[in-house]
Regions:
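Acidic/His- and Gly-rich active-site-bordering loop/insert found
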Residues: 1-38, 53-62
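Acidic/histidine-rich catalytic neighborhood of metal-dependent amide-processing enzymes
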Residues: 37-93
């Protein structure tokens, strides 16, 4: 099972940003964008790894589940209830 989140911290104070907070920027060969490291980059890496494995083998070797949520930065208030309500669907190897 892979877990990831797509929410990000608030932009305030916006005047401290070196580039527009809602616009990806490349500086010195690095990507600067809200969520690019926490956690959208990790989520993207997981999807690309799955895609590469499927292209090479045609199937995944395990029963894989992916949970993506949008409340991690504020404590994931609904995640526990969601997992409890969907235990059978979330069963993975």
């Amino acid at each position: 099972m892979f877990y990831g989140h797509y929410d990000v911290q608030p932009v305030d104070p916006v005047e401290l940003w070196e580039s527009p907070p809602f616009e990806a920027t490349i500086r010195d060969g690095e990507i600067y964008a809200r969520g690019s490291a926490d956690d959208k980059g990790q989520v993207f890496m997981h999807f690309k790894a799955i895609e590469a494995h499927l292209k090479k083998t045609g199937k995944l070797p395990v029963n894989m589940k992916i949970i993506l949520e949008g409340e991690e930065e504020v404590g994931s208030a609904n995640l526990d209830d969601f997992i409890k309500a969907h235990q059978s669907e979330l069963s993975a190897d």
